[in-house]
């Protein structure tokens, strides 16, 4: 349960909170995270979980946890998401100016958020979320010295979710939920701290949620070819991880099989999304 208390503090303070992730994230990760010419679903799914985690840490200003006197670095996030902290193969994804930064999902900054408040002004009916960052704190602030004492790495950087503030030429997902999907902290924790589930399971779960949740009966038809192209996994991997989600009762699948008149096109399977409860 590595660094579970940092995430649990968010729950204690704010309840079962959520973040909005752009639907274009799946295709962007699949197209940009490859091993040779092929998509690397293991690294893409890690990248997705990484984006979700830093979104929670940024939105609820928990990169530095005053209560636990800890701060979360990339090596910690690797460990939270099932990697050894010394693993180098995924650094190309999360480093400054790495893949996540280059495709515009994140940016790297030393100016991490420390508090937030809602203003009286609104965007699309949502109160504006005003962040205070470490550089905005006065040295006389009661917590300034506490932050500086906890953060021992002088080169400490965090990821800012760019899509929070601007997404597809519109206001960001803090204020515009169009073409996004919701991930709750409960969902994230249910996958991350379950030894029976991994990042690929979470990636596929989020994909099905993005397609089905909010539809009539939370149900939709999706061709297998669509999933394979957008998620970038083999048929065998898709079925293995889909069955894990079915076993957990997160989804139900009504398999339709192949069209008789066209062996190249699959009849859409019907997916029903139940989700973490």
Where are these regions (language model features)?
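Short recognition helix of helix-turn-helix/winged-helix DNA-binding domains
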Residues: 1-88, 113-220
């Amino acid at each position: 349960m590595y660094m579970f208390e940092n995430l649990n503090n968010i729950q204690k303070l704010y309840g079962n909170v959520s973040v909005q992730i752009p639907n274009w994230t799946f295709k962007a990760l699949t197209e940009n995270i490859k091993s040779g010419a092929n998509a690397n679903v293991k690294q893409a799914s890690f990248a997705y979980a990484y984006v979700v985690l830093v979104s929670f840490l940024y939105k609820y200003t928990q990169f530095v946890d005053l209560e636990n006197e800890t701060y979360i670095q990339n090596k910690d996030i690797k460990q939270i998401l099932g990697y050894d902290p010394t693993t180098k193969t995924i650094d190309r994804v999360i480093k400054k100016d790495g893949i996540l930064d280059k495709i515009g999902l994140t940016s790297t900054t030393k100016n991490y958020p420390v508090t937030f408040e809602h203003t009286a002004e609104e965007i699309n009916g949502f109160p504006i979320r005003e962040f205070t960052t470490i550089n905005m704190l006065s040295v006389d602030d009661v917590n300034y010295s506490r932050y500086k004492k906890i953060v021992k790495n002088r080169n400490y950087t965090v990821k800012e979710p760019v899509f929070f503030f601007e997404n597809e030429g519109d206001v960001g997902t803090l204020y515009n939920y169009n073409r996004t999907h919701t991930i709750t902290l409960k969902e994230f924790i249910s996958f991350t701290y379950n030894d029976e589930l991994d990042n690929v399971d979470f990636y596929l779960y989020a994909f099905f949620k993005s397609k089905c949740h909010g539809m009539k009966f939370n149900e939709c038809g999706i061709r297998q070819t669509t999933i394979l192209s957008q998620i970038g996994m083999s048929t065998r991997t898709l079925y293995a991880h889909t069955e894990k989600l079915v076993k957990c009762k997160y989804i139900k699948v009504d398999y339709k099989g192949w069209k008789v008149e066209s062996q190249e096109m699959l009849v859409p399977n019907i997916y029903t999304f139940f989700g973490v409860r």
